[in-house]
């Protein structure tokens, strides 16, 4: 039994990893070796012989056992890039009864440089909300270059479903040291193009460029408690075909198909729209649709809408209840994440239109507040 490397997975949101790196940086003297030895003892104690990932929590120079996953994990490539070891091949060979091809000393001798893996998820990180962003990927251009690898889960034209994991792909980068790996990862993410759905790339870049990350001062709660994502905006429209083309704005319209309502977003020319007002036509410019809101139906309308497709997992209010503006009324699950849908005004619950387990579409009214 050998241990290959440590990894750090502290950059998380909702206890789900965003960025992983190997080896774990800023560990105290002897900590990495002690972790490796503890991992080997754990595997031997239960008679486990295959690829496994042992997780620890590290704080103030001490580490504590969390769990053991009897498999490789999503971030295993970041270990591969600093060792040159194909961990999947090793897993298969061990499962077929072969012996490990290297000793502990040989594994240690192969380690070189630093690796970073960034998960590209179909989520909108605007305002730090990380709302699911299902839809069709109209264009995907992967980064490349020396020390850069991209493991893709989707291609241009594929649709990211609301029912499954929204991992679009993984950017894995190697550098001769941690600062080089960080700089190379930033360059790779800035080169990557994903259109059609929002992704976590803006949040990933904010993390990598932050001085706390460079100084290893971040923790598992750092993204949610310290990282400022207020400046992150929803995806921009595609560039016009030529310089003389009219600028585009995002418009949203609601359509109904077989009794189901859907919000359809379109990028259209920014031209005046004629609306009736006081018996006379009046020109009004369209406005860009707001993104990431927890409740729709207009400000203070009382019609609480869900912003995306999903499943209602919990109803938090009943008819007759008094609620405050911003209070959660239902919990919506989409893409394996729970989202609290909130009241847009204070009042009394007049109607609850859904129950736990119901499937809803974007724009559906779930609660009416009078």
Where are these regions (language model features)?
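ATP-dependent carboxylate activation and anion-phosphoryl transfer catalytic cores
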Residues: 1-240, 282, 287-288
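Short, solvent-exposed loop/turn motifs
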Residues: 99, 261-263, 328, 336
């Amino acid at each position: 039994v050998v241990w290959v490397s440590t990894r750090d997975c502290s950059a998380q949101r909702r206890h789900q990893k965003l960025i992983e790196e190997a080896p774990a940086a800023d560990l105290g003297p002897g900590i990495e070796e002690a972790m490796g030895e503890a991992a080997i003892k754990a595997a031997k104690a239960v008679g486990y012989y295959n690829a496994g990932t042992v997780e620890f929590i590290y704080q103030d120079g001490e580490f504590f056992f969390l769990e053991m996953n009897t498999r490789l994990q999503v971030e295993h490539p970041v270990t591969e890039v600093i060792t040159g070891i194909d961990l999947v091949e090793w897993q298969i060979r061990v499962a077929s009864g072969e012996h490990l091809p290297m000793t502990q000393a040989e594994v240690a001798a192969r380690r070189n440089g630093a690796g970073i893996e960034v998960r590209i998820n179909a989520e909108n990180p605007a305002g730090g909300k990380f709302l699911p962003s299902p839809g069709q990927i109209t264009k995907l251009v992967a980064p490349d270059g020396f020390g850069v690898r991209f493991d893709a889960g989707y291609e241009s034209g594929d649709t990211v479903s609301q029912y499954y994991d929204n991992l679009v792909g993984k950017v894995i980068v190697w550098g001769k040291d941690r600062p080089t790996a960080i700089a190379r990862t930033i360059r790779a993410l800035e080169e990557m193009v994903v259109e059609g759905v929002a992704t976590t790339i803006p949040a990933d870049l904010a993390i990598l460029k932050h001085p706390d990350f460079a100084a290893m001062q971040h923790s598992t709660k750092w993204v949610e408690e310290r990282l400022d994502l207020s400046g992150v905006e929803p995806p921009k429209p595609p560039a016009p075909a030529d310089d003389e083309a009219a600028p585009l704005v995002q418009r949203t319209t609601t359509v109904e198909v077989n009794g189901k309502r859907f919000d359809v977003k379109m990028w259209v020319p920014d031209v005046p729209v004629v609306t009736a007002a006081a018996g006379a036509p009046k020109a009004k410019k369209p406005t860009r649709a707001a993104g990431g809101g927890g409740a729709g139906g207009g400000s203070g309308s009382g019609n609480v809408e869900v912003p995306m497709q999903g499943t209602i997992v919990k109803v938090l209010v009943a008819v007759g209840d008094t609620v405050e503006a911003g209070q959660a009324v239902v919990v919506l699950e989409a893409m394996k994440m729970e989202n609290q849908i909130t009241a847009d005004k204070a009042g009394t619950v007049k109607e609850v239109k859904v129950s736990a387990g119901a499937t809803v579409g974007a724009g559906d009214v779930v609660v009416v507040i009078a």
